[in-house]
């Protein structure tokens, strides 16, 4: 139990929380850009679960089949995460994230706009969305290496980015619930269209990030 206590005489005062670090971090534009990118990425993580009820209620897929569509994401995750990291190291993180956002946008728009598609096509689209989703989720924080965020506030920066970037965990279920309660089965279409638009916003976020990094490199020369 003594391991949980620190001697007040030996405590390092520099380790205490400093609110000024939060203010310093919130003044960094790259932190807000990362918040936007993470937020757009995590929207899909919180939305793919609706593929299951959409498949069973709109496409007429059996309950077992709808469950398989959701579980399939867990099997794709390790391959997409590792593969995305390898490709990001070779081709560049922003480029891979842009491609992944585009894949998610195309897949989600197709699911929303073509409700009479065949089940194999639907499963293939879901698989593509999962690949893009876990590819981005696996490399989003690696962008911090290029962001020029000072090491002394990097922990605080991660805290701020996560606090804002993970807001979809609260917002998405509430939003989806309101849309589905209002429009019933048609609500899936509207919700997926909104998700697709957010994926396009993610691409814009990457473009802003690239421009910010170019300016930063020019200033450092």
Regions found by a protein language model. Name each.
Residues 81-92, 180:
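Helix-to-loop junctions at the C-terminal end of transmembrane segments
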Residues 93-143:
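C-terminal transmembrane helical hairpin of 12-TM major facilitator-type secondary transporters
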Residues 178-199:
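A membrane-interface helix-boundary motif in multi-pass transporters
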Residues 29-81, 137, 172-173:
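Extracytoplasmic gate region of multi-pass secondary transporters
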Residues 148-184:
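A late C-terminal transmembrane helix in Major Facilitator Superfamily
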Residues 1-11, 205-210:
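C-terminal membrane-cytosol helix-exit motif in multi-pass small-molecule transporters
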Residues 62-70, 118, 122, 154, ...:
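Juxtamembrane helix-start elements in MFS-like secondary transporters
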Residues 7-35:
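Juxtamembrane intracellular "pre-TM" segments in multi-pass secondary transporters
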């Amino acid at each position: 139990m003594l391991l949980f206590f620190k001697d007040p005489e030996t405590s390092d005062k520099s380790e205490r929380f400093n609110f000024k670090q939060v203010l310093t971090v919130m003044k960094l534009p790259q932190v807000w850009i990362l918040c936007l990118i993470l937020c757009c990425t995590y929207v899909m993580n919180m939305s793919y679960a609706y593929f299951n009820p959409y498949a069973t209620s709109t496409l007429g897929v059996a309950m077992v089949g709808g469950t398989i569509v959701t579980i399939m994401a867990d099997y794709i995750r390790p391959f997409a995460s590792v593969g995305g990291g390898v490709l990001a190291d070779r081709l560049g993180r922003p480029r891979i994230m842009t491609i992944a956002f585009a894949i998610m946008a195309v897949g989600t728009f197709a699911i929303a706009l073509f409700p009479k598609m065949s089940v194999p096509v639907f499963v293939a689209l879901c698989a593509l969305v999962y690949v893009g989703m876990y590819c981005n989720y696996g490399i989003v924080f690696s962008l911090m290496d290029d962001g020029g965020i000072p090491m002394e506030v990097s922990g605080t920066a991660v805290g701020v980015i996560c606090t804002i970037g993970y807001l979809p965990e609260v917002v998405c279920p509430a939003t989806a619930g309101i849309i589905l309660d209002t429009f019933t089965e048609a609500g899936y279409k509207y919700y997926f269209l909104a998700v697709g638009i957010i994926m396009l916003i993610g691409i814009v976020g990457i473009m802003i990030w690239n421009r910010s990094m170019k300016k930063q490199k020019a200033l450092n020369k």
